Amino acid sequence: MAKKVIAYIKLQVKAGQASPSPPVGPALGQRGLNIMDFCKAFNAATQKVEQGLPIPVVITAYSDRTFTFITKTPPASILLKKIVGIQSGSKRPNTEKVGKVTRKQLEDIAKTKELDMTAADLDAAVRTIAGSARSMGLVVEG
């Protein structure tokens, strides 16, 4: 018989740095899941990813207190900030521009995020990422 799903828990945890402290501990503790098992498994799964990069994770909690999890790619805004080398986006994106991003850089991000995006093709994914860049106050070139 299939296990009964009791909850889906969505978190953003830094790659290789999962620990029992918030937000991981309280979210898993409420469901009665073993926090250290998750931390060890997550840190092992994100070992090849750049350390400290926030990774979205969806944890499926089952009624027998077991869990599975799926890691996703980092948010586009984080990847854009990393490429451009800024700490945060513009507070007024339509008037204050904080950096420039090229079509090639957008394509690289779109290829990275391809699995998590619902875009029909690479061009649609690039347009989506370009929209995120503009809303952060970045100038899209090309």
From Swiss-Prot:
BP terms from Gene Ontology: translation
Annotated Gene Ontology cellular component terms: cytosolic large ribosomal subunit
Keyword Metal-binding: no
Post-translational modification: One or more lysine residues are methylated.
InterPro entries on file: Ribosomal_uL11, Ribosomal_uL11_bac-typ, Ribosomal_uL11_C, Ribosomal_uL11_C_sf, Ribosomal_uL11_CS, Ribosomal_uL11_N, Ribosomal_uL11_N_sf
A single GO molecular function term of this UniProt record: large ribosomal subunit rRNA binding
UniProt KW keywords: Methylation, Ribonucleoprotein, Ribosomal protein, RNA-binding, rRNA-binding
Function as written in the Swiss-Prot or TrEMBL entry: Forms part of the ribosomal stalk which helps the ribosome interact with GTP-bound translation factors.
Subunit structure comment from the entry: Part of the ribosomal stalk of the 50S ribosomal subunit. Interacts with L10 and the large rRNA to form the base of the stalk. L10 forms an elongated spine to which L12 dimers bind in a sequential fashion forming a multimeric L10(L12)X complex.
Family per record: Belongs to the universal ribosomal protein uL11 family.
Protein name: Large ribosomal subunit protein uL11
Organism the protein comes from: Xylella fastidiosa (strain 9a5c)
